[in-house]
Regions:
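N-terminal "domain-start" segment that seeds a small globular fold
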Residues: 1-11
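Hydrophobic/aromatic beta-strand patches that form the interior of the parallel beta-sheet core
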Residues: 3-5, 22, 53
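Local sequence-structure signature of Cys/Sec-based thiol-disulfide redox active-site neighborhoods
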Residues: 10-44
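Short, basic/aromatic recognition patches
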Residues: 65-69
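Short loop/turn motifs at secondary-structure junctions and domain boundaries
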Residues: 71-74
Length: 85
């Protein structure tokens, strides 16, 4: 299982070697839980293709909002963001 990241800064994301897959998840949302479970079914393949960052949007809402702002995307949950180069 992937571990949750408590601190993330877009300027420190290194996506040169492989893309970074940011998964924003809420454990209070059944749709988010289903989405995370589907991603976990493909965990081995995803780990080969990308560096995976998992964010709990309930526990780390401020970081989740900051990340959305830095990347210029709307804050959603569930949400998958791919950062490449």
């Amino acid at each position: 299982m992937w571990s949750y990241t408590n601190d993330i800064d877009v300027s420190n994301i290194d996506s040169e070697a492989k893309p970074v897959l940011i998964i924003k998840h809420s454990n209070r949302c059944s749709i988010s839980s289903v989405a995370l479970n589907r991603l976990l079914e493909s965990q081995a393949e995803l780990d080969q293709r990308a560096r995976v960052i998992l964010i709990d949007v309930i526990a780390n809402r401020s970081n989740s909002l900051l990340l959305a702002s830095q990347l210029g995307v709307d804050h959603e949950s569930p949400q998958v963001i791919i950062v490449k180069n």
